[in-house]
Amino acid sequence: MSEHTTSQTQVTVTLPDGESRSFPFGTTGYDIARSIGKKLAQDALAVVINGRAQDLDSPVSEDASIEIVTFDHPLGKEIFWHSASHIMAHAIEELFPGSRFGAGPAIEQGFYYDIASSHRFTESDLHDIETRMIEIGRRAIDVRREELSRQAAIDFFSSTRKDPYKVEILEDTLKDTPTVSIYHQGEFADLCTGPHLPNTSKLKAVKLTNISASFWRGDSSRESMQRIYGIAFPSEKLLKQHLAHIEEAKKRDHRKLGAELELFMLSPEVGSGLPIWLPKGAIVRNELESFLREEQRKRGYVPVYTPHIGNIGLYKRSGHYPYYSESQFPPLTYTDDLGREEQYLLKPMNCPHHHMIYSSKLRSYRDLPIRLTEFGTVYRHEQSGELNGLIRARGFTQDDSHIYCRPDQLVDEICNAIDLTKFVFATLGFDDIQIRLSLHDPENQDKYGGTKEVWEQAEKDVREAADRMNIDYFTGIGEASFYGPKIDFIVRDAIGRKWQLGTVQVDYVMPERFDLSYIGSDGQPHRPVIIHRAPFGSMERFIGVLIEHTGGNFPLWLAPVQIAVLPITDEVHDYAVQVRDTLHAAGMRVELDTRSEKIGKKIRESEVAKIPYMVIIGQKEAAAGEVSLRRHREGDQGNMTVEELKEKLAKEINDKS
């Protein structure tokens, strides 16, 4: 048999543990899972072939690295929940004929679908839909992907499905896409890129959680729709665990704790999605910003400030407009005294402003890297149904930095940015972190700025940095920004939820668009490379997640009130004031409770306020020049002098422990 023939009949598959196996040409992901083990084949949801998530029945037609996706895989829940949204739409279509469907994505905790229906859904309908979803699961309906021309898809959704929403997407959003994919599930079908579950039997448990109003394509001037949220699992046990987590999450809800602990407020008079920081919340935010500022200073960053608005031409040049136009506030139009019209945007990104700072003077290769940093407020017109306190807001502040470097400095700078982000998360108690290399989709190159060669180089650099830092990561094809690949940090909180927070992103595109340059050692102009970097992501979202992660029990260095001084009787008032003043002079945040209340009530109220330490002072302590120390949730810590207390607390604050 010739070498050529062998290469056509066999493929070499590399598994995640590095093992290589040979399989017949055209072997599917399911075949590979079955060859590894019966249990893996039963649990398999999809397959990742050379970094791209695909349906489990996808054939392997070349040598490839392979990952079998189960529910616990980094991509597993997203794929499962996306398929569950299709099963929900299928159930609704059977129960409420004539319903039509808008968007139906997986989200951080479950899925939703936007529905156009003459039926007004109520909470009582949710149980019927859940029951029908489980029934569809029991039918074990095969899910089939069909690829067809855009025109054939338009004909299908016009005549067979009678779905004007998908026709609009095909004629508008996908007008330049020659081939599209449809997923069929019995009588149900939808326009979708996938991947999806191989059949509906994987769904064993479901809970529909909420109904809200929405609009087609998020545009309030378009048709109103109804959005149903839900979550689903491959077992009842997992659903029960999730519901228990939901109860715990309600106790930790940052909106509830934010009000109880007086951290922030939301005011309809101010506007939806525009949180206001109260004094105690401002302390938490200021401490976090100061922490990052100092760490950045040590690492060579320099601060800048930029305006809250910018000329629309700036964002057209960067591509943020019209690329993000659907999530931006409408342009502000200004006419000067001469009748000349200018348009401005509320700043959707800090990046273009920083690029203008870089380009404001001639740069030498010796000047690089230049690391600009700003806590810059940006604005996004998020849909009202998606707003969620601090975690999803319309106005928020990014800890935004841009590093301008030479190509030979790039990998080192990416490594430094990764190191800083890991340090920030470790300091704040996020120990369970997944890292995703978010790459572009080469089959949809038109979605991205820059050439194929530029993207290949950028992704090579990102992989090299991740490998050098010895971090475990998974890849997400199609998850890149339009101007570059990125490293996304996904943290798991105290009750197991995942949150995407920090990011490090490589950008070869913006230097071209903004004609950025430096003079090299050869005396000629060269393009720098940009790294976009934000460990927190946004201050609002990060603090919202931190509140829920800690349950409002902030570490001492972050707590708005660090110590409550609680005198037992009025006779020790003067000594209590001395203790308060001594701790305050040492830079600690102290409250003195002089009310004529029983000490038990004072302690209970301090516990409810989640104040880390309580200093109890009675006549015995005052006479001895001591205090009795209590720790929140831990109780009595013993007696000590004020000086010993000051040293103990100062060490804990400085260590950020």
Curated annotation (Swiss-Prot):
Principal subcellular localisation of the protein: cytoplasm
Keyword check for Signal: no
GO cellular component terms attached to this protein's record: cytoplasm
Reaction catalysis annotation: tRNA(Thr) + L-threonine + ATP = L-threonyl-tRNA(Thr) + AMP + diphosphate + H(+)
Superkingdom, natural source: Bacteria
Cofactor(s) in the UniProt record: Zn(2+)
HAMAP family, per database record: Thr_tRNA_synth
Name of the protein this chain belongs to: Threonine--tRNA ligase
Source species taxonomy: Bacteria, Pseudomonadati, Chlorobiota, Chlorobiia, Chlorobiales
Gene it is expressed from: thrS
